[in-house]
Amino acid sequence: MSSKVSPLAPTDVPAMPMIAGVRLATAAAGIRYKGRTDVLLVEMEKGTTVAGVFTTSKCASAPVEWCRDKLKGGSARALVVNSGNANAFTGKSGKQAATLTAQLAAKAIGCKPAEVFLASTGVIGEPLDATKFDGVLDALALDAGPDGWMDAAKAIMTTDTFPKVATATVKLGKAKVTINGMAKGAGMIAPDMATMLSFIFTDAPLSASCLQALLKAGVTDTFNAVTIDGDTSTSDTLLAFATGAAAENGAPKISRASDPRLKAFVKAFNAVLADLAEQVARDGEGARKLVEIIVEGAKTKVSARKIALSIANSPLVKTAIAGEDANWGRVVMAVGKAGEPADRDKLSISFNGIRVAKAGARDPSYNEKEVSAEMKKPVIQIKVALGLGKGRDRVLTCDLTKEYVAINGDYRS
């Protein structure tokens, strides 16, 4: 957690409403940090369904493996998250730590260990002493309440500079349902079917299979379209929980993601995911500029995504943006190396709506002063038009600054 808040942090922080069936509490367990909270317990009422998507890393953490296995049951009663230690690449002791954490949480709230979901973030390769949770989780279970969403988001931070929360309220049938979310990010972010640590909660009565389908579809153009440094974490976890409490107010029970009654809910659900994903991009380690990459005119959407990611992950492109340089030559380089169909002589590039390159060469109307003024702004849009088809996609990233190097050079110090 940095004491210096990113200049890209949202200016408006939403008031997070209560969600029936969800209680939260945080504490300082002394996992790594001093003088701050580092463990979160979320308790959910019986009947809560769960869905999740996780890292594709072949070196997944022990909590990720635990959650993947328990997700088969489709039900959840608790979520335990710790910051400061990722419990990744920790061998047999890592699995034992995950098991002990789940057992302690289950004892604290009175459920089965298989109904406890886990997430850890922090340093990789250091054993997690789960005995530090003994007693702490019991106290959290007693202290848990329906408020405290911002405190929860703060407890899961590592190098983040601000807590990330989002909320939406929508009608399901004739009843009002709420969707709350929190996330943490900052570095080692290039998600694939998941991201960092993100948790979504709703009181909508959704089956586990329905929730899973919504989550899997929702991450495609939100969390999976964000990259900070091109590195996919061992711990990426996105979990969604539905308590179903809104059924008491007349919300219909939904078992299929294709149910037309879900239309407004899906829109709101995806909006929460998109909001959190953008906050992650805004809080990239050392970031001073939010960068939106749009690729259009590609052969396919898949091709457009790959080209957009090639641009977004290029250190040369990102450092040019940090230097407020509209260096379209580096964008051309990134397009060319993406391995996707592209025609140099059809390529056009613009920065914040000002075209700098057209038909494979510098735009005849290029004005250095005009473009330089745009590059000083905190939000930069790079649009690439390939002129080959109708494929289009969008990716969010940030610039690459000296501070990113400093943060990661000192991370274990």
From Swiss-Prot:
- Active site per UniProt: T195 (nucleophile)
Return the EC number. Answer: 2.3.1.35, 2.3.1.1
Record's keyword annotation contains Oxidoreductase? no
Q: Per UniProt, what is one GO molecular function of this protein?
A: glutamate N-acetyltransferase activity
| GO-annotated cellular components | cytoplasm
Residues binding substrate: T158, K184, T195, E285, N408, S413
Name the domain of life. Answer: Bacteria
Q: What is this protein called?
A: Arginine biosynthesis bifunctional protein ArgJ
Which gene carries the instructions for this protein? Answer: argJ
Subcellular locations according to the entry:
Cytoplasm
Q: How does it assemble?
A: Heterotetramer of two alpha and two beta chains.
Family designation: Belongs to the ArgJ family.
Organism, by scientific name, is Rhodopseudomonas palustris (strain ATCC BAA-98 / CGA009)
What is its pathway? Amino-acid biosynthesis; L-arginine biosynthesis; L-ornithine and N-acetyl-L-glutamate from L-glutamate and N(2)-acetyl-L-ornithine (cyclic): step 1/1; Amino-acid biosynthesis; L-arginine biosynthesis; N(2)-acetyl-L-ornithine from L-glutamate: step 1/4
Primary location: cytoplasm
Q: Which GO terms describe its biological process?
A: L-arginine biosynthetic process; ornithine biosynthetic process
**Reactions that this protein is recorded to catalyse:** N(2)-acetyl-L-ornithine + L-glutamate = N-acetyl-L-glutamate + L-ornithine; L-glutamate + acetyl-CoA = N-acetyl-L-glutamate + CoA + H(+)
* Marked site positions, Cleavage: A194, T195
State the protein's purpose. Catalyzes two activities which are involved in the cyclic version of arginine biosynthesis: the synthesis of N-acetylglutamate from glutamate and acetyl-CoA as the acetyl donor, and of ornithine by transacetylation between N(2)-acetylornithine and glutamate.
Q: Which UniProt keywords apply?
A: Acyltransferase, Amino-acid biosynthesis, Arginine biosynthesis, Autocatalytic cleavage, Cytoplasm, Multifunctional enzyme, Transferase
Site residues (Involved in the stabilization of negative charge on the oxyanion by the formation of the oxyanion hole), renumbered to this chain: T121, G122
Q: Is the keyword Iron-sulfur assigned to this protein?
A: no
